[in-house]
From Swiss-Prot:
Residues 111-314 form the PNPLA domain. One of its GO terms (biological process) is lipid catabolic process. It comes from Arabidopsis thaliana (Mouse-ear cress). Highly expressed in siliques and at lower levels in roots and flowers. This is Patatin-like protein 6. GO terms for molecular function: hydrolase activity; lipase activity; phospholipase activity. Possesses non-specific lipolytic acyl hydrolase (LAH) activity. Hydrolyzes phospholipids as well as galactolipids. May play a role in disease resistance. The gene is PLP6. The nitrogen atoms of the two glycine residues in the GGXR motif define the oxyanion hole, and stabilize the oxyanion that forms during the nucleophilic attack by the catalytic serine during substrate cleavage. Transmembrane segments: none annotated.
């Protein structure tokens, strides 16, 4: 080992300051080493070897010149005063001490938003509160969700919220605030859902849901007004927005990482949003092509493919070593998953349900399936995090409400009364105790409320953001044009393995 280090430093061993002196001290002063010493190294010899290697390592990596002083500082145990940074240093870096974080890998921050139609008001209110908490804890009145999350995934209405929060017209700041998400749905939802759809299939779906149809043209107009000619490349951070492709009979992920590699995977954002919210029986399917016209997709609701896209986002990070080179496992992630509410108080009249035919079960079956799938993903992700789930994974979900039974068409009812009820459910949800999935233990009610959990998360996000300026290596290295694409089939394969 020493011979190798000699070659690295290009100088003889005895020219390294203090080395001869150390050898003489450890061997009685004459510098001689007996055969017994070679065969049975003492504790002092082992300690000496460690100190020598530390000196060589420090000289090679950091250029220290005073080796004896360095060795003495290493041999002393740090006092409590030495371990604590001065108040001035803490204040200068907002509580971040450079020496304490330079060797940490940091955490990749992930945001995921479920599908759920008008129930999207619930996660929208949670996003608005989180952004407010980020402004408060960072001291930055212009703080945005996109400043603190590295990856975002959203399905259905969650996909539209994701695009709103991360799309940028100038490549610097997002177009929308978090408050705009739920207000967009509350104010414009009625224009999307107030039209009775034509066609036999849509009439069947309408009959089964007991609710209204939708106007795809008005939704399309709203998306065009919001995003104009922006594409997936125009998002500030990696985004993942799913749909179900009828041409391939498989899920399809719209991905910024793919779009940066080739125009064949770059789509206009308004089309992406229209596709992920193309609920069967409510909005028409969307035939769309990539910006270069080479990739064709006939898309329907992303909620059919993955109502809870958290697993897709996590898998994307774990396999994307170009953008997230230092992630070794879920312990290096900080994940926020927002649900659209498990409203178990949906009212079904037993006598009527007993007489339902297949057409009547259409929309209720879709809703039950989507909510069940979202909960299954939550359970699987929680199991994957294991013992670190409380510090690395946060799920915010409404579990019932005090507003009484909900209508079966709560997802598509944009009436003022339903909107007001959903706003009330969202505010009540933030006050509810946070519930987490426990390995083989169902749901566990925590002592913290969802408000408190989001406050804690905001603090962690701000701290992670500050620490990154003090680290030697970057936590993230976002992809530029021409980089290798993460294969979608790999992502879907690993999602399947989680179950």
């Amino acid at each position: 080992m020493l011979t190798t280090m000699q070659r690295v430093h290009n100088k003889p061993i005895d020219s390294i300051g203090g080395f001869k002196h150390l050898v003489k001290q450890s061997n009685g002063g004459d510098g001689g080493v007996t055969a017994t010493d070679m065969q049975e190294p003492s504790i002092e010899t082992d300690k000496l070897s460690y100190e020598i290697f530390s000196i060589l390592e420090s000289k090679f990596l950091f250029g220290y010149d005073d080796d004896l002083k360095l060795m003495e500082s290493r041999s002393r145990d740090p006092s409590p005063e030495q371990e604590t940074a001065s108040p001035a240093m803490v204040e200068a870096l907002n509580g971040v001490v450079p020496g304490t974080v330079k060797n940490q890998r940091g955490k990749v921050c992930v945001l995921s938003i479920d599908s759920g139609g008008m129930r999207g008001i619930i996660p929208g209110k949670a996003l608005a509160y989180l952004e407010h908490a980020l402004k408060s804890k960072s001291g930055d009145p212009n703080a945005r969700i996109a400043d603190y999350f590295d990856v975002a995934s959203g399905s259905g209405i969650g996909g539209i919220f994701t695009a709103m929060l991360f799309a940028s017209s100038d490549g610097n700041r997002p177009i929308f605030k978090a408050e705009d998400t739920w207000r967009f749905l509350a104010m414009k939802g009625k224009s999307f859902y107030n039209k009775s759809p034509p066609g036999i299939l849509n009439r069947v779906m309408k009959t089964g849901s007991g609710g209204s149809g939708g106007s795809g043209s008005k939704l399309e107009k709203a998306m065009k007004e919001s995003f104009e000619e922006l594409t997936l490349k125009d998002t500030l951070k990696p985004v993942l927005i799913p749909c179900y492709d009828l041409t391939s009979s498989a899920p399809f992920l719209f991905s910024r990482a793919d779009a940066l590699e080739t125009d064949g995977y770059d789509f206009k954002l308004w089309e992406v949003c229209r596709a992920t919210w193309a609920e069967p029986g409510v909005f028409e399917p969307v035939e769309m092509r990539s910006v270069d016209g080479k990739t064709r997709c006939v898309a329907v609701d992303g909620g059919l493919a993955m109502s809870n896209p958290t697993a897709a986002a996590i898998t994307h990070v774990l396999h994307n070593k170009q953008e997230f080179p230092f992630v070794r496992g879920v312990e290096d992630l900080l994940v926020l998953s927002l649900g659209t509410g498990q409203l178990v108080d949906v009212k079904y009249d037993c006598d009527k349900v007993m007489k339902w035919k297949a057409k009547h079960w259409a929309r209720p079956a879709v809703r039950i399936s989507a909510d069940g799938a979202a909960d299954t993903v939550d359970q699987a992700v929680s199991m994957a995090f294991g013992q670190c789930r409380r510090s690395n994974y946060v799920r915010i979900q409404a579990n019932g409400s005090s507003f009484g039974p909900c209508k079966p068409n709560i997802d598509t009812d944009a009436s003022p009364s339903n909107v007001n009820m959903l706003v009330g459910v969202a505010e009540e949800m933030l006050k509810q105790k946070n519930a987490e999935s426990v390995l083989f233990g169902g749901k566990k009610i925590n002592e913290e409320s969802n408000y408190e959990k989001l406050d804690w998360l905001a603090g962690e996000l701000v701290l992670e953001h500050q620490r990154r300026s003090c680290r030697i290596a970057p936590t993230v290295a976002f992809k530029q044009s021409g980089d290798r694409r993460v294969d979608q089939q790999t992502i879907f394969k690993d999602i399947d393995c989680m179950f």
